[in-house]
Amino acid sequence: MPTLLLLRGKGFPEGSEQFMFEQSLKTEVGTKQDADYVFYELTRSICPECLRVIDAQILLRDTKVFMRKRCPEHGFFEALVYADAQAYTSASKYNKPGTIPLRYTTAIEHGCPHDCGLCPDHQQHACVGIIEVNSACNMDCPLCFADAGAGFNLTLEEVEGILDHFVETEGHPEVVQFSGGEPSIHPQIIPMIKAAKARDIQYVMLNTNGKRIANDDRFLEQLAEVQPVIYFQFDGFDAETYRIIRGEANILPEKLRALDRLAASGMPVVLVPAIERDVNEHEVGRIVKFGIEHPAVHGINFQPAFHAGRHAEHDPLQRMTIPDVIRSIEEQTDGLFTSTDFVPVPCCFPTCNSVTYAYIDGDTVLPLPRVLNVDDYLDYITNRVLPDLGNEIKTALEGLWSSSAVPGSAKTLQQFAISCAACGLPDGSLDLGELADHVFTIMLQDFLDPWTFNQKNLMKCCKEILLPDGKQIPFCAYNSVGYREQARSQLTARQLARVRAERTGVVFNPPPLTFNFNQSLSTYKNGKKEWPN
């Protein structure tokens, strides 16, 4: 680990410009030193203390990738952004041209990241639209990017308006995910799911900790009727893991009960583990093996812990990244999956997301990239001639290697079957229902936080928070820049005003959501870290 001269992530590792400047004062005249890093590129980021937009350098050092930036008020910061420099630099070939939405919602006025969204500067449409229907939760996790707690409940009418606007901007939206807070405790979550399914939206997901599914028979019956894909919080098996990450050491039996009930109800599940350094990285392999064996689970979405919202103190130079999780998968599954099985996702910025698919037949696990050279079809830099059926296979692979791919869905299975036609996997005799039992997906998603925020990545983000006034804000901007805090404050005030209006018989006309970053920056500078209504 590099030597740090300051605390709290502001340290100057050996080789940094500040370190070398200080060392130069001690160096004999006439001698020079080479930096121990390669300057790779310049981007824009934010100060983790005051959220000011500042320049940031991307550096390659010790086979890893770091971000270095300096705030004129708060000094230098460094953070690990990718634990494999070679994979990071080669990922650019997977950078697919973006898809333009049917229309934008905001104009360019202040510049990225303060014009969300989506504004015309944004380079990708919304593959996944996330609706946070409430801020309340039935858990109090120490690690919670949403900082869940008392606040607001969206109304069914508001959610229907959000869905209609999403259809207007996307035409045929691919995925809507209901989130929170804990969306399962919203009293109208079932009508909300029905509203999404009644519109031209391909897949509807419910992001949940599973508590209500484990304990509420009537809710489980209602959920089984509408059949959303369940995006299921599952961080491992050790009590200590859940004590540190979720604040409840003995929650595993409840989660296993929920998964078994989902299997009996026929609802597809994607496990979503948050992986924190020195907490549960040792459980990655066991999670993979469990997912393959459990009848409800069609895939896993590993998410290296990011530090926005509510989180413990952390060392930004020691954070988990996608290559760290892939390495753990390889080491802990005895080669069932290796690093070469995972391919960056082209629709977002390629270092944000990696995916692999495997054909499962008994004890045999065969990752698709071992029998089909995915690079031949997803390399957007090299001008390659595709083989026969190449365009059809390319289209199928682009669908699989997309942030909107839903494990176990009919569309994903069809695309997998087309890909298999090029590599001889034994799928031809299976219908899609049977094929679902043989296809397993592992995704890895690394989100930005105030330490790793990269404007280049943000501008191609395809996961957007959908708000009641029509704004679609990239997920990482919503969590890092100050949108979440301002939106929550205004939505909470809006709910109180609605209640007062209903009590007095006054027609309630909700004011639009507005975002004031000059005021936010000033509030942060004063050390309050909160936003006015």
PLM ranges: what are they?
Residues 2-127, 139, 460-479:
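Flexible, acidic/Gly-rich N-terminal and inter-domain linker regions that tether
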Residues 4-7, 13, 20-21, 264-434:
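Radical SAM enzyme [4Fe-4S]-AdoMet core and its adjacent flexible, acidic
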Residues 19-42, 415-447, 495, 501-506:
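Short, compositionally biased leader-like segments
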Residues 63-84, 94, 98-208, 212-221, ...:
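Conserved alpha-helical substructure of the radical SAM core
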Residues 147-153, 243-250, 315:
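Short glycine-enriched, charge-decorated loop/helix-capping segments at active-site entrances
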Residues 160-177, 186-304:
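Radical SAM/AdoMet-radical enzyme domain recognition
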Residues 396-491:
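C-terminal functional modules
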Residues 462, 468-533:
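Generic C-terminus detector
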